[in-house]
């Protein structure tokens, strides 16, 4: 009798689909991650995804009705990335026309100095790392952290209708990493 029970359990185990095993479960999502010396806390509504190119140290994505939004994180040694202003100018040059004045804010948090930029207007298409086609009403949210020996750059770009609802999350992510009081 015991043999038949063991045989029955063994056959049942063999009949389990492969999806019943842990290897098929999605990878756990990190709650926090590091880019250089900075710690970022992933917002609950965003997913961690592998960086899509070698310049990115980390990448988060969120599905929206207008497509997928990405928050990208990059690290650049101070000598190779230019000044904070050069990076802000580079982002501004990605727009052929601004519908609102650029909004820049420099703050020194308890962790490091942080400069944020918000741009809204027509985002050029066909640029490396940018959209394939021009986006007429686009918004760029950016932050540059000045850490010891490097800049950590965080950026989210997309249609303004998609960026508007996540703007608070983005700035909260930046404030926490930079040690900036709300």
Question: Which role does the model predict for each range below?
Answer:
Residues 8-19:
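Bacterial N-terminal signal peptides
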Residues 36-97, 124:
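Secretory pathway targeting signatures of secreted, lumenal, and periplasmic proteins
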Residues 44-46, 148-182:
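Surface-exposed amphipathic alpha-helical segments
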Residues 49, 63, 90-98, 120, ...:
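Structured segments of extracytoplasmic/periplasmic soluble domains
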Residues 66, 80-84, 134-137, 156-159, ...:
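Solvent-exposed, acidic/flexible segments
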Residues 88-145:
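Signature of long, low-cysteine stretches enriched in small and polar/charged residues
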